[in-house]
Structures are given as structure tokens and as C-alpha cells.
């Protein structure tokens, strides 16, 4: 390629990467900004040397302009030292974007991810939508580094999405939208025009699917998937059939924040960019310098009003009816804990009172997950896991963050995905 063509190509890529954002975003009212500042501080102060480094948190910190420089440095160094062989494609993609947002060279991580994705194929048509989440993140990260080399992978991904009949989860659809929007904006000069048509068609299908999950109060899917969905709907070049009211969504999210719904650092990491008017497409444009905002003090932002101290009763059931598992059971216990206690306290009290409720946990980027109850453990090969429900509704938070109410019936159900 001639030097002039190469230069023009890169200029057009840069321009495309920063333009085409539709005016479908909204901002936090100034008088509500202290609540957002408080969330950001809570997320940043959760970073410790002993925890697994979470690239999603570093991305959110950098997009929002970090307050805690020490936490930023710690996460950056931890992610730079991470072994690519230990990471899934999705984790590797997030690590690349996190390091890029910290103005660090991801090094060989990019070529490793590129090689992994060149051999990517869906496990089978009709596979669960979650199997597209990691590849979508990978295409997003690779697109931001070299869209020309990513084009064949993205084309194969888009065609596969068009063949997929089952609806996507909001999270998967949102990340796929961000990935294909990046490719749509950065189609290399001289490429066939039908590539843009393909990405546009795939985006239309996905954003229409997301728009069908918009509830009357503006929440998209659930409150924890709304952050990624807001990013997707604010940048997609394809308008969804169902109109999205960004201000209504923002109003409801702020109301949920005031009620203390966002306490998990990972949940904050996914909503914070939208609260700051940013998306993952902004990662390459993050500037790094010595000037940073002065962090607000703890007295500068409000906190949710604590509940009164009293005991509540929680009805807790553990259930395993899966065929092929040796031990079948359905056992219920009533547990008394202090009002405002998290679900983990209920599990601990049930375990103390009855050995059948013995459980084990595993630490993930979303916090603790229950991996085993009554000696029945999750199994990736068999696609089994413990799902927690309130009545018949799956919980949107983990056991270390969900706060049950008086006489709520919580069920831990061993099931398959």
C-alpha cells in the first residue's frame, strides 16, 4: 500500500471512530451528580491488591476520569502482568481495552486475541446467546486496534448473528452492537460496500431486539443490563423500531442508585460510563496526563438511608431436581436475620442451623457466587449452576449484595443454562 493511501486510511479510521454518534444520549442533572460521584468513589475504593484485577473497573475509571490514582496504577500493573493463557477471549478483550484506556501498550495480548478469533466458530447454531458475549468483546477490542485485520472476523460474526434465531440477552446484544458499530464506523477504504450493508442489517436486528426489552420505566432488561444497553442505543447507526427515551431511563437509574441498588463494583463499572456520557467506543480517545480531578470527600455526596435495625424472616429453599444428579432434594428453612442483611447472611445462618444447607462460594469479577450447595457443585461441562430466585424471578444481584425483605421466599435452584 502506498504511503499516501496508508496515511489517508488511518485518518479516515480516526475520524470514523470519533464521529457518527447519534444524539440519543442524555446527561445526569447537575444536582444529581453527587450520587454519581459517590458511586465512582465506591467502585474505585473497592480495588485492593488481594482481589482479582477487574478490567471493567479500570475501563470505567478511565472513561469517567479517575479520582483514585493509586487504584488506577494498581489495576493497570496487575493487568499488564496478567497471563493471556489464563484468560478467556472476553477477559482478554477487556484487558486490552483497559490497558488502552490507561495509555499502555497491550503488547502481545492483541496478536494472541487476533489469532484466537481467527479460528473462532460458534459451538453450534442455536447456541445460547451468552456464547456470543466474549467474541463480541473481542471484535470490539480488535476493531479499535486494527479494523482492517478484524474485518474478516467481524463479517463471519455478523453473518452468524443473522442466522441466530433465538433472542439475545440484553448484555450480549449491547456488546454486539458496540462491536459492530465500531466496525461499521471503521470499514477500511476500498472495502466492498456490502460490508457496511451487512453490519447495518445485523445491527438493525440486534437493536430492535434490545428495544423490545425496554420497560415502561425506561429500564432495559433489568437495572444491571441497562448500562451496557444505554451505551449501545446511544451510538448505533441503526435506529430501533421502538423509540427509546433516554431521559426516562436516566431518571429511573438515578432513583435506583438512591435506593442503594448499585453497591457491587462490577455493576457500577457497567453503569458509570453511561452516567458520564461515555461508551466503550471512547476508549481509544481517553487522554492520560498528570492533571486529574480532585476527589470529593465522603461528605460531598449522599448515601442511601439505612433501614431500621430489626429482625426479618426469610424463607429459604434449596432445590435440585435435575436428572442425572445423584442427590435430589427440596428443603425449606425459615431464617431470622437483621433487617438490611445481605442474602449471604441468610445462607450462613441456614448453614449453621442445618448441615444440608452447607454451601461454598467462588470469587468472580461480579463478586461471590455460590458454586456448591449440599455438596452439589456447578459444572461447566454439564452447564449446571445454582440460580437464586425471589419467588419465580431470578435475582439481579449476587448473594453478597442482594438484600432480602421480610418473609421473602428465596430459592436456590440447581439448573442448566
Swiss-Prot record:
Kindly list the GO CC terms recorded for this protein.
Answer: apical plasma membrane; endosome; extracellular space; microvillus
Instruction: Tell me the leader sequence span.
Output: 1-18
One annotated GO molecular function is: cobalamin binding
Consult the record and explain the modifications the protein receives after translation.
Answer: The N-terminus is blocked.
Q: Where in the cell is it found?
A: Secreted
> Residues where Phosphoserine occurs?
191
Which positions, given as ranges, span the membrane? none
Kindly report the protein's main subcellular placement as a broad class. Answer: secreted
GO terms under biological process: cobalamin transport; cobalt ion transport
Tagged with keyword Ion transport: yes
Concerning InterPro entries, the annotation shows: Cbl-bd_prot, Cobalamin_Transport
PROSITE patterns named in the record: COBALAMIN_BINDING
Binding positions for cob(II)alamin per the UniProt entry: 171, 222, 270, 365-370, 386-395
Q: Which Pfam families match?
A: Cobalamin_bind
Disulfide pattern? 26-246, 103-288, 143-182
UniProt keyword Cell inner membrane, yes or no? no
Membership in a protein family: Belongs to the eukaryotic cobalamin transport proteins family.
The entry describes its oligomerization and partners as: Interacts with CUBN (via CUB domains).
Q: What role does this protein play?
A: Promotes absorption of the essential vitamin cobalamin (Cbl) in the ileum. After interaction with CUBN, the CBLIF-cobalamin complex is internalized via receptor-mediated endocytosis.
Would you tell me the protein name for this molecule? Cobalamin binding intrinsic factor
What is the originating organism of this protein?
Answer: Rattus norvegicus (Rat)
Q: Which gene encodes it?
A: Cblif
Amino acid at each position: 500500500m502506498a504511503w499516501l493511501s496508508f496515511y489517508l486510511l488511518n485518518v479516515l479510521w480516526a475520524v470514523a471512530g470519533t464521529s457518527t454518534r447519534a444524539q440519543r444520549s442524555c446527561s445526569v442533572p447537575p444536582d444529581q451528580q453527587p450520587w454519581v460521584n459517590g458511586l465512582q468513589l465506591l467502585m474505585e475504593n473497592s480495588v485492593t491488591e488481594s482481589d482479582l484485577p477487574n478490567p471493567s473497573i479500570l475501563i470505567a475509571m478511565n472513561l469517567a476520569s479517575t479520582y483514585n490514582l493509586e487504584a488506577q496504577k494498581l489495576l493497570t500493573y496487575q493487568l499488564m502482568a496478567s497471563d493471556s493463557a489464563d484468560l478467556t477471549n472476553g477477559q482478554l478483550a477487556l484487558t486490552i481495552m483497559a490497558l488502552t484506556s490507561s495509555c499502555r501498550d497491550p503488547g502481545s495480548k492483541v496478536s494472541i486475541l487476533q489469532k484466537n478469533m481467527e479460528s473462532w466458530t460458534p459451538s453450534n447454531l442455536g447456541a445460547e446467546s451468552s456464547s456470543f458475549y466474549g467474541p463480541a468483546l473481542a471484535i470490539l477490542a480488535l476493531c479499535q486496534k486494527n479494523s482492517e485485520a478484524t474485518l474478516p472476523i467481524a463479517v463471519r460474526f455478523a453473518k452468524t448473528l443473522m442466522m441466530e434465531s433465538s433472542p439475545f440477552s440484553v448484555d450480549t446484544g449491547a456488546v454486539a452492537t458496540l462491536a459492530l458499530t465500531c466496525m461499521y464506523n471503521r470499514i477500511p477504504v476500498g472495502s466492498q460496500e456490502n460490508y457496511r450493508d451487512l453490519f447495518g442489517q445485523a445491527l438493525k436486528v440486534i437493536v430492535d431486539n434490545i428495544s423490545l426489552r425496554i420497560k415502561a420505566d425506561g429500564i432495559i432488561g433489568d437495572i444491571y443490563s441497562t448500562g451496557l444497553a444505554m451505551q449501545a442505543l446511544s451510538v448505533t447507526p441503526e435506529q430501533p423500531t421502538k423509540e427509546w427515551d433516554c431521559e426516562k431511563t436516566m431518571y429511573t437509574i438515578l432513583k435506583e442508585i438512591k435506593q442503594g441498588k448499585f453497591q457491587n463494583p462490577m455493576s457500577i463499572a457497567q453503569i458509570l460510563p453511561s452516567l458520564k456520557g461515555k461508551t466503550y467506543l471512547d476508549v481509544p480517545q481517553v487522554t492520560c496526563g498528570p492533571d486529574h480531578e480532585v476527589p470529593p470527600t465522603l461528605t460531598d455526596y449522599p448515601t442511601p438511608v439505612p433501614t431500621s435495625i430489626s429482625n426479618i424472616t426469610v424463607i429459604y429453599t434449596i432445590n435440585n431436581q435435575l436428572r442425572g444428579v445423584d442427590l435430589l432434594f427440596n428443603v425449606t428453612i425459615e431464617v431470622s436475620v437483621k433487617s438490611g442483611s445481605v442474602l449471604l447472611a441468610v445462607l450462613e445462618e441456614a448453614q449453621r442451623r442445618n448441615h444440608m444447607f452447607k454451601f461454598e462460594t467462588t470469587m468472580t469479577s461480579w463478586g461471590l457466587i455460590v458454586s456448591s450447595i449440599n455438596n452439589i457443585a456447578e459444572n461447566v461441562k454439564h452447564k449446571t449452576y445454582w440460580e437464586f430466585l425471589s419467588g419465580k424471578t431470578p435475582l439481579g444481584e449476587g448473594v453478597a449484595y442482594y438484600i432480602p425483605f421480610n418473609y421473602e421466599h428465596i430459592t436456590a435452584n440447581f439448573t442448566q443454562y
